[in-house]
Each structure stands twice: as structure tokens, then as C-alpha cells.
Amino acid sequence: MARNATTSSAATAPSEGDPNISRPMNVTASSSEPAINPTLTDTPTATFLRQSTAMQDATLYPGGSRSLSGIAVHAFGLGLALASSILLTILLLHLSNPLWRLPSFIAILSVFHFLEFYATARYNLPSAKLSSFLLFSNGRAYNIAHTCAMLEIVLVCTFFPSWLAVVSAPWSRALGLGLVLMGQGIRSLAMAQAGTNFNHIPAKQHKEGHELVTRGVYGWLRHPSYFGFFWWAIGTQLLVGNAVCGVAYVLVLWKFFSDRIRGEEEHLVQFFGEQYVNFRERTGVAIPFIR
């Protein structure tokens, strides 16, 4: 009789349950603390949580050097500037208004600054930052030069339109457009082929993984990005008919690249030794009077 009572009591008592049913835990006899079952943690949710924790990079937040919201705003602004400039250029050309030069110059600048960031983000992701757009990080002289170019366009077109017949012939505009396209293409190609070896700021110390690129466009030009920018900039001034800024661009850019190449190559010889010396001997710069 007692046996039956015991059996009945056990049957009616609430079940403690198996902890392995309600949660992915294993309880061992030697420990009262549940242990995480390693076979149950490799789930999409667990993987997402681990990745989310790893992505807590302060530079990606607003105000950071790689701020995603900042990148979005910059890209949107450049796209808006490009679209509106193209439409305004077409309208002013249709009206035979010489001021078409101003929006066309802005359109070219918009493409340049977008491609600077895009090429960096696409082929050199670790170096991609807000500053890669080069909108506000390319030096005060750069911004002053383009501001002066815009002012010359407005002043000449408004007060001295007859001067354009002298300095802006159809052939010079065609040559300018050709130089812009060639220069932009070679610069972007150079950034793509250099990959992570490209940097907007010349390296002064040899970092691990930095290689000397000698393939592709680097097989003919040892500084193709400088070549591209030099002729791109001159092309913009030929296209818009800026005589004063055109001459100033040539002089300032030649001086800038002459000094920069000389200083940069001193470090490159230190980094790569005889390999760079031989590379320098068989390639050129293609900027007048810079060897």
C-alpha cells in the first residue's frame, strides 16, 4: 500500500523539467552553473551579434574620420552638383551664353572629387575616409586656385566677353576637354592599379606590405596620378578659356610636383633601394622638365 502511495505521489508531483529543453545549456553533475553548449552557439543570430560587437568603430559614427553619414552627405552633394551643373551647362549653351563655362567647370570638379573617394573605397578600402573626397583636405592653395578660376570665368564672361574670342577658340576647348578626360582616366586608373599601395599623402616610412608597383600604367609612368592631375588641371583652364589662371595653374603645379616628386623619390629609394633606381631609369614622368 505504501508502495502505491509513493508511486502515485511521484506521478502527481510537478516535473522539474530538463534545462536542455528550455535553453541551449548543459548542466553537469560537477557544477551547478550551466555551461554554454558550443554546438548550439554557431547560429546566424550569434554570428550577427559577434560581428556587431566587432564593428563598434567610433570613426564610422557622425563626426568620425570615416563617418558613414558624412560620406552619404558628401556623395549626395556631389551628385546634386553634377546633375544641376550639366543641366545648366546645356541650357546656357542653347542660349549661346558664355557663362556655360562656370557650371561645366563645377561638373568636372564634381566628377573628380567623387572618383577620388570611389577609387580609394573600391581599391584601397583601409584608407577610405571622408578626407578621401579631397573636398576640404587638399590644402588651402587648392581651394584658392579653383575659386580664382571661377572668378575669372564670371568676370571675363560678364565684363570682357570679346576677350573669349581671342583666348577660347574651338580647337583649344576641344584640346582642353581631351586633356580633362585623359588626365582623369589615367589618374583613376593609377589609383586602381596601385591599390593599397596608393596614398594621397606620400609615405615617409616604409610600412609592411608596401610594394613597388611597376605593372600597367606604372610601366610607362612612375607617377601616373601626378601626370593625370597635372594635365587634367590644365585641361580645365583650356576648356573654360581662362588665360590668367591657365598660366598660373601651369607654374604653380609644375613647382608643386617638381618639389613633391623629388622629396617622395628620396624616400622611395630608401624603401626599395636599387629596385626603385632601376625603375626610375626606365620610366618617365611626362610633366615638362621633370625627370
Which sequence ranges carry the predicted segments?
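Membrane-anchoring alpha-helices and their flanking helix-loop junctions
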Residues: 2-208, 235-291
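Active-site-proximal inter-transmembrane loops
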Residues: 201-229
